[in-house]
Amino acid sequence: MTFQILLILHIAITAVWFGSSVSTPGRIRRGLQAGDAEAKWMVSETMRALRMSFIFGILTLISGLALIFQLGGFKHVGKNIHMSMGMVLIMIVLNMVLQAIWKGAQQKFNETGDHSILQGVKGKMVMFGGMQQLLWLVVLGLMVIKI
């Protein structure tokens, strides 16, 4: 019974993490195409989403570890779980990189209001966001396929 509750909690937490990270590149693109008010909203909303993604990434890691230890530890789970844990750690690090990039751009944009600052980091945000989405695809596949 405890395992099932932990599993449901883990899936719910992971869904929030996925949802908060998947929309970031599109939000940035739409915010830059719109006017000043929308760009200001997009800048703060993107940072909020990155922070939320980081928090739920850590919670996913913790709930995943709880599931592993509920099963008896790492020697009792498959290689797919080991690989997924490593990829989750990489995604958390990527999120930290995204936050650092965006925080610098956010501060400069708030000081100057210059959209070109955001255009300059858009490519990096999309690139790191794309890496994160690729890792998501692999991790979700590993949760279904047993190795």
List where the protein language model places each region.
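Polytopic transmembrane helical bundles with strong interfacial aromatic enrichment
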Residues: 1-147
